[in-house]
């Protein structure tokens, strides 16, 4: 049967990735992403944008993204599971990712697929623990919105 079937000997794979980041034991960042198999990858994309590249939520969720799609599609209704696999080594990138970067990825052996629309649908909320400032953002291209209310 299908890998996500609930039956003896299988380990269903789900894509839910609610993410809460703590700083000194207190919540400072929350991420939610809708998008099936792309959820984990998009969560990592925007978390790295925040942690490594210092982007605030509005920039982190709207920056160009990428996703590997060389695995079996969990949501493919095709009963022939062999046809549910995307081409090995394929990489989907946002159309806004620079041509030079796309060419470099292709040179490294990736089959680059350019997507005009969004890759998954992220929202992010950040609390600056020093100032108390709240930042909330959703990717408008994905029609996502985020809001926060400071009750202090």
Regions found by a protein language model. Name each.
Residues 99-152:
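In a subset of proteins, long, contiguous C-terminal domains/tails are tracked
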Residues 1-115:
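Proteins synthesized as precursors that undergo proteolytic processing into mature forms
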């Amino acid at each position: 049967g299908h890998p996500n079937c609930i039956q003896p000997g299988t380990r269903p794979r789900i894509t839910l990735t609610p993410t809460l980041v703590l700083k000194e034991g207190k919540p400072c960042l929350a991420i939610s992403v809708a998008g099936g198999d792309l959820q984990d990858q998009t969560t990592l994309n925007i978390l790295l944008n925040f942690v490594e590249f210092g982007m605030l939520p509005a920039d982190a969720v709207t920056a160009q993204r990428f996703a590997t799609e060389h695995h079996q599609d969990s949501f493919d209704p095709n009963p022939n599971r062999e046809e549910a696999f995307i081409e090995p080594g394929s990489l989907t990138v946002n159309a806004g990712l620079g041509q030079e970067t796309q060419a470099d990825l292709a040179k490294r052996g990736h089959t680059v697929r350019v997507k005009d629309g969004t890759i998954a649908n992220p929202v992010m909320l950040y609390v600056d623990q020093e100032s108390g400032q709240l930042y909330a953002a959703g990717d408008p291209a994905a029609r996502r919105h985020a809001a926060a209310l400071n009750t202090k």
